[in-house]
């Protein structure tokens, strides 16, 4: 297949790939037979959705997609012990990770327990002092004062710390990759255990917790007792799923779609307060979960107090919610300032290493709370898997982020097994690691080799998939609303990207923090407003008035300002329009 619009190398060095003739034919038939907008039909066809599947895809229902919780190993013993502790009034502790998934998972349990008239102790370790996951001193202290400890979003590899919880039962609800053996405890419910053969590995921890609560409610119903309303808690599952970059496919897509509906009702004081502080005055989307609310919930665990996010998500008190939201917002501002310095240093260091399969950087004094975000930025900038490590004395603690098709979690897990890391683990798109300073070069060299075997760092122009060609006059709010029926969009479910051909630049200016605001004309009365985030110093800055005609590509969105809704393009790429 030739390059779409003959763009074999764009301003950002990419080759444009558009729909095939067969995809065009199928989309035409789907649009006609299912009475869909052609752009929506093409979006569905490009994602492998046939006409028979389209109705179910456009209206995903949990009752059709939610799996039986008991398909997960150890779910039965976990539900038995959890419900037993609740009904006997035993002392329960929740040990959670300090990120959004951990906080939302903890908030799910705390909310459900509160609706059942029970309370639980929340424990979230300090990122710097204790690190990720259960540790022996904390587990021993909790075991001395509790009958049951539920570890969420952590614990699968915590053999020693869980053994230290003598005197208390332990349940693990997790989704990180498991090892060859499991901790000795009541249950390890994890779709990514090595002995799991199901297709639920894409669930985040909050999704696993939700399934436990579904099973608990089912058992309560069998006993003639109504359980708490789980549908009202789907806002937490949606937030965790998007913020943890879990694939928005299958049941995850239904969980997020319904969770966004619940969130729009503003029934959870913490999320309502956070939305107000973030000036989010429209119905939330998956984008808002990942880039507006998620970072603020995460900020406490990154640079502040680890339990702030979970407390915000769990509280029923509007006054407490407001106070916590203000603290988290302040921490998020601090996080941005810290992140900017680390990012500049990491980008320069990685650039100096050249173009290998892995982009990595390490530095003394870097804040461990921001290395994950900086790794994500480095991955986006280089389109390669990235690792960023904060060094402190002889030890480095880092985060890894990957690109589609390259399993960073498996590679990190293998490095730990080979002794090149003190510890490490994660999932396909993200992982964490701890490494000795003197082993760092060897570890990164080995990781680079493992990732290269998966195709990381392949040379040549990168492909930019496009879902079709539109005219500026077609970019209306009703078209965007139609396309959004294929959402929510996110990991493994990207929003459709369209091209617009042969346009001139009518206006360009820099806005905000280095963003480009551009207006395009097509010479036939059509105009398209666009924004290119962070592009003021990049190749797209060549889009200047009077600089010629261009093909452009990006994602359409509705921009709401002072009650007025307009369409704008999130501009991702452009190329000179070659006249024939």
What are the language-model segments listed below?
Residues 138-246, 412:
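Conserved phosphate-handling catalytic cores of large alpha/beta enzymes
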Residues 175-176, 191, 367, 427, ...:
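Histidine-centered active-site/metal-ligand motif
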